[in-house]
From Swiss-Prot:
Domain notes: The transmembrane helices are not perpendicular to the plane of the membrane, but cross the membrane at an angle. Odd-numbered transmembrane helices exhibit a sharp kink, due to the presence of a conserved proline residue.
Membrane-spanning ranges: 24-53, 91-115, 126-146, 195-215, 227-247, 288-305
Regulation: The matrix-open state (m-state) is inhibited by the membrane-permeable bongkrekic acid (BKA). The cytoplasmic-open state (c-state) is inhibited by the membrane-impermeable toxic inhibitor carboxyatractyloside (CATR). Proton transporter activity is inhibited by ADP:ATP antiporter activity.
Assigned keywords, A-Z: Antiport, Cell membrane, Cell projection, Cilium, Differentiation, Flagellum, Membrane, Mitochondrion, Mitochondrion inner membrane, Repeat, Spermatogenesis, Transmembrane, Transmembrane helix, Transport
Protein name, entry field: ADP/ATP translocase 4
An example Gene Ontology molecular-function term: ATP:ADP antiporter activity
InterPro entries: ADT_euk_type (IPR002113), Mit_carrier (IPR002067), Mitochondrial_sb/sol_carrier (IPR018108), Mt_carrier_dom_sf (IPR023395)
Membrane topology reported for the UniProt record: Multi-pass membrane protein
Region (Important for transport activity), start-end ranges: 251-256
Amino acid sequence: MQREPPKRKQEKKVEKGLFDATSFGKDLLAGGVAAAVSKTTVAPIERVKLLLQVQASSKQISPEAQYKGIVDCLVRIPREQGFLSYWRGNLANVIRYFPTQALNFAFKDKYKQLFMSGVNKEKQFWRWFLANLASGGAAGATSLCVVYPLDFARTRLGADIGKGPEERQFKGLGDCIMKIAKSDGIVGLYQGFGVSVQGIIVYRASYFGAYDTVKGLLPKPKETHFLVSFFIAQVVTTCSGILSYPFDTVRRRMMMQSGEAERQYKGTLDCFMKIYQQEGIGAFFRGAFSNILRGTGGALVLVLYDKIKDLLNIDIGGSSSGD
């Protein structure tokens, strides 16, 4: 009987450790702010990458008018659509990216608590490493289920090359979602979702898992110099982006079909096969170099996230710093 109070107190502490609303909210804020800042910075590169990926499936871009590469795309966008068109779809992208990245980071830490409970890094290194991979992949897949319609709309808005309102396919985020939902139903907003889940797990598993693992091996992760953290994050985002890029290309091609009377691809597998047969393996990586440049923004997100969490004094037992 005398040991009852301490036991209840311990159970209460464990329960709080599994979900702390305050730290969870701060985690969302830290990840969201970092994501919004970096995404706005690399928006022009983001749009170039997107156009290079989907131009072969776009009804607005004829074969002879397709962009020849990154430089050609960068030069023609302001000339044909206006300078501000570099940021076309950026507002939708920020709206999408804020909850996406914030949920990724927040859930990742919660998944780490579940996957890594009782795991000793020194004695069970590979189990610890796999737990990092699993937490990153699970976080990405979970958040994708919530924000996929926004990602879909952002893709369609970014791929819209009309110069004036009368030439544009969609007037904005709301118009895009309403038109697709009206023509194809809610299912139309989830076109390419299956391959997206596959790609996001591959990307997030390496993105979060490798970053946490490398930082966790440093003597004092909390005291790591900003440039060292940025270099680690840059390598991680570059490798993760290249590894998952074919999945990203296919999912965006599938997104371009919603609302169209004629479908170019019957499904994900058919899309993979036709791209390979008709355009070659290089088509899967079209715009990949711009994606590497864009990855600088992703690396900045990881580093800013750690710094913002430090400023907010967040300590939830499993941060991106690899504590």
